[in-house]
Amino acid sequence: MGIKSFMGKRAEPEKPAEVPMLVRDYMTEKLITFRENENIMDVVEKLIKHGISGGCVVNDRNELLGIISEGDCMKQISDSRYYNMPMTDLTVGKRMISNVETIDGNMNVLDAAKIFIEKRFRRFPIVENNQLVGQISQRDVLKAALRLKSHTWSY
């Protein structure tokens, strides 16, 4: 007669509850936004004051018109110096990127990570019903990954 184990059956590891990890759950909703007619130097001040690298450009109805970044401001400063032109009359509308790609707020945040890698953007606006509702950044995606703790990539 063989040896019997008295330990019993091993318990199955608990699976984490399935929680959808949507872009809307990690996006930033309180945004620093800019206006199309805003002066570039005012934008530079806001970027520095708030410690951000760029932001969305909206109209009075909060509709997305474009994105302005530190890089766009740097180009303007460089061009102004090169052509010896004052920067007082230069507006966001002249330097912003107006063909803006957005991400759906209902998209899985890990699918959004793939888009960040493919497009090489630092941020994506989220628009619903033609209204800017938020923005997701690479840092927001990293926060979602921390929540998973890399133990499993299922959610």
Regions picked out by a protein language model, each given a short descriptive name:
Residues 1-155:
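Tandem CBS (Cystathionine beta-synthase) repeat/Bateman regulatory domains
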